[in-house]
Amino acid sequence: MKIICKWMGIALLALPTLFATNVMAQVLKKPTLEDLLPGGETYRIAENKWYQWYGDAACLELGIDSIKGIWAVNGVGAKAGENFTVITLKEANKLLAEKELGKLRNFYSAKTINTPHSAVIGILLQVDPLLLLNTGKYRVLIDWKKKELIWNQPCPAQAANEDWNEVSRHLAYTLNNNLYVMTNDGQTRQVTTEAEGIVCGQSVHRNEFGINKGTYWSPQGNLLAFYRMDESMVTQYPLVDITARIGELNNVRYPMAGMTSHKVTVGIYNTETQKTVYLNTGDPTDRYFTNISWAPDAKSIYLIELNRDQNHAKLCQYNTETGELMATLFEETHPKYVEPQHPIVFLPWDNNKFIYQSQRDGFNHLYLYNVKGELLKQLTQGEWLVQQVLGFNRQTQHVIIQSTETSPLQSNIYSVSLKDCKRSLLGNSEGIH
């Protein structure tokens, strides 16, 4: 009897271990190729993509059930490094339900409004605590501190190429080939009434030369520059839409080599007068108009004109009221080609100076100009590329760039002084930043 009890005790002690081993055997899974390859169904590289800035005060993380934040500076009732909850999905949907404006499933499409409400106080960007949300049927603004829904605008059905301005809260969009504007109070205005073959408010020139859209709001959002592309003279090319259950014919206009190309003009629509002025650029035949940018006061607009041979570019300034050419600031030529890819960027602290990007020395670099078209200095140089202008440090008067200076296999962030052109590496020097 004692022997039996002894073995029973051993068996009882072993049961938990056997049970745990059995559970582990059920949980453990051999990884498959699909599990280990990026882009597979069960594996993806972690990306810090759901983040927004609340002015210079805090960084917000957009999530499914809530938006979290961390204070970046010491403020009223907060310390740098402290975490806080901006708003929950339950709170947001309650505000939406009260006005029957739809429902959110997550906050991934939320956007902070970082327009200064009182310019720049000290060195920090002061902004209102507003979140732009889209339910699919309505675009809404929520004051996340007061937990109040302060504004809404219906989303136009079948709209494409939407371009919303956070200052005026006007929305530019296209229906088929024409351009429309919905004002901040929900009024719909048709800006163009063109027939088939003429496209307005959409990307032109086959998305070359940095063009990726067709509308450009002025800084205050009361003027809208847009492309008008006449391609009625371009031969149609048949393509088959294979996404349909039964293949469908889709004719597109494509200028083959040596054949007639489309003609592009640039219009400026005034939301207050509801009138449109077209820039007097002359005959648009075999010319490209690219890299549109506004002067800070919106009294003039800048663009780069390029010939069809793509070896002669001109930076031109036009009057936004009359559409007349005010000045050709400078020209750039090359025996083979020039490739303007970026609009000029004005310095936040000086409306009379701007940064121009060019590959004139064989590598894409930054050049500082004044509004008279005079080259003040070359800000960056070397056998490497400036990939992006990311922003500015107003306090130190530096421009922040992404470049390949460390290695052509890497992208690193640098701070460049506009005073002496010295560069400082931000963060470590390894990897993609």
Task: Report residues per predicted region.
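Positively charged n-region of N-terminal signal peptides that target proteins for export
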Residues: 1-7
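Bacterial N-terminal signal peptides
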Residues: 9-20
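Beta-propeller folds
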Residues: 10, 24-433
